[in-house]
Structure formats: C-alpha cells, structure tokens
Amino acid sequence: MTTTMNRLPVSTWNPLGVNYAPASAALPAVPAAGWAKAEALSPALPAGVTAPAAADFGSFAASGMGAETDAWLAANANLVNHLAVTGTADAPVVFETALDTDHPHALTYLTIDAAAGSSLTVVQVVRGDAEDGISANLTRIRAAEGAHVVLVQVQLLGNRARRWNAVAIEQGTSARVEQVRIELGGSVVACGARTLLNHNKCEYDLDAVYFGHSNDVLDFNDVSVHTGRDTLCEMHTAGVLTGSADKILRGTVDFQRGAKRGVGHESEDVLLFSPSARNRTAPLILCGEEEVEGQHAASVGRLDENKLYYLRSRGLSEAQARRLMVDARFAPAIDKIPLDSLQDEVRENVARRLNDELDG
C-alpha cells in the first residue's frame, strides 16, 4: 500500500531524505486470498485486568506512523485484543505471536484502557522467520489520571520477515507511560510512537534499541507532544548497524503553547560496524512556549580500537569484546524487560547476530 508514514512533524531540506519513510518501508499489499490466520498464545490476566470484547478508541490520537497507517493497521488486523485495568496488576500481561509456514502473518491491534490510579505492564513478543512473513502492530494506550502503564515490545524476527509497529498514547494528569522497544530482526522495520502529554504533570519514557544488518531498512519516528504544564519526556535510543543497513530515526519533542515548565530530552547512540552502513538521524525540538527545557543529542561512532585492544589484552576474544560494548549500550532497555527468560533470549539473539557478522 502506498501511504506516507513516519512523517517528520516539520519538514526539513528534502534532499536529505528524512521527511518521511522511504518507499522500501511501504505497507505490504493485501494478499489476494487475504491474510493467513495468526497464531498467538492467550495471555493470563492478573486481578484487576479484563479483556472486553470491544473498546471505544475510534477517535483516538494518531501514532508516530500517522493516522492513515493506523487506520490500515486496525482494518487489516487478524488478532485484536482489548485490555482494561482498574487496579494494580501484580503480574505482566504477555502477548506472544509467532510467524511460521502455517502462520506467516500476524497483524495485531491492541488497546489498553488504564483507569485512574491503575498500574499495568504489557509485554508484546513476536518471533519467527516465515518466508515473506509480516508482523504489523498497532497499540493504543489511554492512561487516565495517575495511571502507570509499561509497554514492552520485543521483536525477534528472522531476516525474511518484515515489521511495522505503531504506538499511540493519550495521557491524563500525572499519568506515566513507559515504553521499551526492542527491534532486532526483519529485513524492513518501520516504527512510530507518539504520545500526547496534554495534561499537567504527565510523563513519557521511551527506551529503544535496534540492530540492522545486511540490506535491512530501518525507519523510526517518535514524537512527544507537550501541551500540559510540568510534563516530562525522556526518549533514548541505542542501535547497531552492520553490513549495508540503512536507518533513519526521527525524534521530535514538540512544546506547544501552554506547556510551561515542560521538559523533553531525546538522544541516540549508534555504533557502526561497517563502512557501508548508512545512518541518518533527525532530532527536532519545536518550541511554542518559552518556559521549557529541551535537549537532543546524537552520537555516531565506530568501535574504539583502543578499547577493543584493551579488552582483547585482558583475554577477551574480538567477538566477546564487541558483545560487551553492545551490551553496555543495550542494557538500559533490556534491563526493563520484566521476564528474566526474555532478557536472556534477547541477549542471546544480539550475541548471535554479532557472531554472524564476524563469521561473515
């Protein structure tokens, strides 16, 4: 499908090619026979959490991927889940999907309605490497006054699958939403998160990591819109690019009029393992209010040969030294995964990808 996704809120010089996602990241065409049935494990629901048959999110804010992409994802979903939480959930709700020969398509739509003062952690995991596999996800979060929602997304696809991941968030007064986004596989990865901090003292945290290799195309667009007073946003991303991977990250902190004493920080730390890898970063801070604090930072570099030599002189192999450097960058996000076994799986996946690059 041809649509403009991951659009930068304010366009920059067009020849840079960062104003929106490239054509190579376009949404997939709907198969003539329709989408294959998805396979998923039904999650256990802790006390205070229910799964209603329907939810009213029809006029919800757009994700970072854009309203048109959101509409397509919702209309084409072959797995739909709604969660409502009214208390403090004592265990995470875990959604697991797998792409395989019989189930190559997982198009998921999840809504989370967190009532005032409630607390919930949701984990979304997708695995598999079906031929022409498709993983497409739309998650919408409504966090009422004082609610706390943690969304952990872990993507462990193989190299033949493609991935789209949209997140839209609306927050009430003093609400807090934390998002962890780990994207390690897929030949095409396009993600966009957008949160509306339109009430006083609400907070949003994003910790994201990605791994691009071979000819992967990675495209990200993360936006925090501040209209309430005393709002806080922290968006931090770490990535590794190898082979001829091509990555664009747009990170926007938008302070609109009335967002007094708003604070927004965004940063990216990219490690390049190949001279053929292409990295583009478009940090953007928009100020419609004077009394705000906005900061952005981007660090792009290659392996420090002195550090590598030091680690190898202490008995580490080159693969172990590289893994240590990557682990240090990825740890803030991985450590937030509430399941120890999933943390281990993510670290093993990263180590395997690094080893494959060295062997290649």
What are the language-model segments listed below?
Residues M1-A40:
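Short, Gly/Pro- and small/polar-rich lid/capping loops
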Residues N6, A47, A71-A74:
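Polar/charged alpha-helical tracts
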Residues N19, D56-S59, Y309:
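Intrinsically disordered, low-complexity N-terminal regions enriched in serine/proline/glycine
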Residues A32-F57:
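Active-site regions of enzymes building and remodeling cell-envelope glycoconjugates
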Residues A61-Y309, S313-L316, F330, I334-G360:
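Conserved beta-strand/loop scaffold segments within soluble protein domains that form the structured core
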